[in-house]
């Protein structure tokens, strides 16, 4: 426990009985780390500031702060140690395989980081004259060329900052195209039952009604159900390919034909592009818009190492409706056209973000493309699919593949039928994986598979690491079937924090730290 009674480490059940309970609460290098606010101390800041003799005048009146806001004061070494110790409590791709399905948690090459830190990219500002950032603009142009070439699409919007933001961009372009054609009455978007949750959420955000398309027993779009729901009220269909069951939509060309025949557009969720990059061009399949997660397929960092980036490629029909700015190349070099009036052929719906997108991610993704080349990117897809099928093949006798017939694509999907009668749930199994040193796979998604366990190893894992992961899962599966429920119900035992009480977390959430009431500032 820390000084406010919050559990900060696992309780070692046998430590006290064996005389191994430590006096401080720490366990070797597993430090008992408090919140940074709890480390606060008077006059501990690492910077000396000159005294203020008189407060500057202010027009804030009643808004002027009259009490401290509770920011912690720490010295520089205390601050550094705090965050380093916290980092040691987290799993990361730099520690072990990170099998989150539909997330493509591949290695982030250090060469990319070196390139992104070149002063010509890292020290520029989006408001400085464009004549002084020609190198950065040229890199954006080259990245756009690669994205268009790999997808077979004629246009790309670089500025969307994540996958869902890319979905928003694509649907706004689709809405603008329909309105320009006098088809503003089309207010429905179709999406499969296995779709990413962001698909219906984005469609609803744009103002569309979402209608689900049924899935066949083999995990793919039901063409008959799709055809029955198409009509002049439908604006678009949103399909992930490969889909979230880890399967390629074999009827994708027919899906596109039916959609276009009904006057609608085909939006492809490109979250799983890593499985087909260099092998399949979505534009050749009839796709009208697709976002590409640079932080998945093209290895730019996830999460705290981010930010994300989700450029959107567009078909010839949607290209005129791409958001500003547009990158052009003329007598004065590369320029960003900021207004729709700058090009009479375009009728943009506006901007997707301030400035020009995630420049650091552009550099990393472009470095990744250059280091692989076209043949290397093709091998990326092949190895990603190979690794997923190796896991599926090695686990199919102890776990239950959701779709056992035929190969999967980049991720292997299992259901929980193999756990029936064991008293162990998908959640229990995932928590036990933490004790074995692995981040859990994606759980309970897609929703169409009961107790889903979605495993995506990516192409950057060696056979040795895959075998280590497989051995851990086989051992856990054996323990579950042998009735060792205690191993699972209490897991994780060896993580910095134990399992939360989910009922209390839902009913009485503590979402922010609340400081002790501060005394008013002393008047001068």
Curated annotation (Swiss-Prot):
UniProt keywords, alphabetically: Oxidoreductase, Pyridoxal phosphate
GO process annotations (BP): glycine decarboxylation via glycine cleavage system
A GO molecular-function descriptor: glycine dehydrogenase (decarboxylating) activity
Cofactor(s) needed by this chain: pyridoxal 5'-phosphate
GO cellular component terms attached to this protein's record: cytosol; glycine cleavage complex
Sections of the chain in a coiled coil: none
Keyword Cell membrane: no
Disulfide bonds: none
Chain positions with N6-(pyridoxal phosphate)lysine modification: 296
UniProt catalytic activity: N(6)-[(R)-lipoyl]-L-lysyl-[glycine-cleavage complex H protein] + glycine + H(+) = N(6)-[(R)-S(8)-aminomethyldihydrolipoyl]-L-lysyl-[glycine-cleavage complex H protein] + CO2
EC number: 1.4.4.2
InterPro entries, per the entry: Aminotrans_V_dom, GcvPB, GDC-P_C, GDC_P, PyrdxlP-dep_Trfase, PyrdxlP-dep_Trfase_major, PyrdxlP-dep_Trfase_small
Subunit structure: The glycine cleavage system is composed of four proteins: P, T, L and H. In this organism, the P 'protein' is a heterodimer of two subunits.
NCBIfam families with a match to the protein in the record: PRK04366.1
Family classification: Belongs to the GcvP family. C-terminal subunit subfamily.
Described purpose of this protein according to its UniProt entry: The glycine cleavage system catalyzes the degradation of glycine. The P protein binds the alpha-amino group of glycine through its pyridoxal phosphate cofactor; CO(2) is released and the remaining methylamine moiety is then transferred to the lipoamide cofactor of the H protein.
Name of this chain's protein: Probable glycine dehydrogenase (decarboxylating) subunit 2
High-level lineage: Bacteria, Pseudomonadati, Pseudomonadota, Alphaproteobacteria, Caulobacterales
């Amino acid at each position: 426990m820390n000084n406010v009674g919050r559990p900060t480490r696992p309780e070692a059940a046998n430590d006290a009985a064996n005389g191994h309970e430590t006096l401080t609460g720490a366990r070797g290098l597993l430090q008992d780390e408090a919140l940074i606010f709890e480390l606060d101390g008077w006059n501990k800041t690492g910077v000396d500031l000159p005294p203020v003799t008189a407060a500057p005048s202010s027009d804030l009146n009643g808004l002027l702060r009259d009490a401290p806001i509770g920011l912690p004061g720490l010295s520089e070494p205390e601050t550094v140690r705090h965050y380093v110790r916290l980092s040691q409590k987290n799993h990361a791709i730099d520690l072990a395989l990170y099998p989150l399905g539909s997330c493509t948690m591949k290695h982030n090459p250090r060469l990319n980081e070196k390139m992104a830190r070149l002063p010509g990219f890292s020290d520029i500002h989006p408001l400085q004259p464009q004549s002084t950032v020609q190198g950065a603009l040229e890199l954006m142009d080259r990245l756009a060329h690669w994205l268009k070439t790999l997808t077979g699409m004629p246009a790309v919007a670089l500025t969307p900052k994540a996958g869902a933001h890319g979905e928003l961009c694509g649907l706004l372009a689709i809405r603008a195209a329909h309105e320009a054609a006098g088809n503003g009455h089309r207010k429905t978007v179709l999406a499969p039952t296995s779709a990413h949750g962001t698909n219906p959420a984005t469609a609803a955000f744009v103002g569309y009604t979402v209608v689900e398309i049924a899935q066949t027993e083999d995990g793919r779009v039901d063409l008959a159900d799709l055809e029955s729901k198409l009509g002049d009220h439908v604006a678009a269909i949103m399909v992930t390919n490969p889909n979230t069951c880890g399967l390629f939509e074999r009827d994708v060309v027919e899906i596109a034909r039916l959609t276009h025949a009904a006057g609608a557009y085909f939006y492809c969720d490109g979250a799983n592009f890593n499985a087909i990059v260099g092998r399949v061009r979505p534009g050749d399949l009839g796709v009208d818009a697709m976002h590409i997660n640079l932080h998945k397929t093209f290895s730019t960092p996830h999460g705290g190492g981010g930010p994300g980036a989700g450029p959107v490629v567009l078909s010839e029909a949607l290209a005129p409706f791409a958001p500003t700015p547009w990158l052009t190349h003329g007598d004065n070099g590369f320029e960003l056209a900021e207004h729709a009036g700058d090009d009479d052929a375009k009728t943009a719906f506006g901007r997707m973000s301030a400035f020009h997108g995630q420049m650091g991610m552009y550099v990393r993704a472009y470095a990744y493309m250059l280091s692989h080349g076209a043949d290397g990117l093709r091998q990326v897809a092949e190895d990603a699919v190979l690794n997923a099928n190796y896991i599926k093949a090695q686990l199919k006798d102890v776990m239950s593949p959701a779709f056992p017939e035929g190969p999967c694509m980049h991720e292997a999907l299992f259901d929980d039928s193999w756990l029936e009668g064991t008293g162990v749930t998908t959640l229990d199994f995932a928590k036990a994986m933490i004790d074995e040193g692995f981040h859990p796979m994606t759980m309970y998604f897609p929703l169409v598979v009961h107790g889903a366990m979605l495993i995506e190893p990516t192409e950057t894992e060696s056979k040795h690491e895959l075998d280590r992961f497989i051995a851990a899962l086989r051992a856990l599966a054996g323990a579950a079937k042998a009735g060792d429920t205690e191993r699972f119900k209490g897991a994780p035992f060896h993580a910095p924090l134990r399992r939360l009480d989910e009922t209390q977390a839902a009913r009485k959430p503590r979402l922010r730290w609340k400081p002790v009431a501060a005394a008013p500032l002393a008047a001068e």
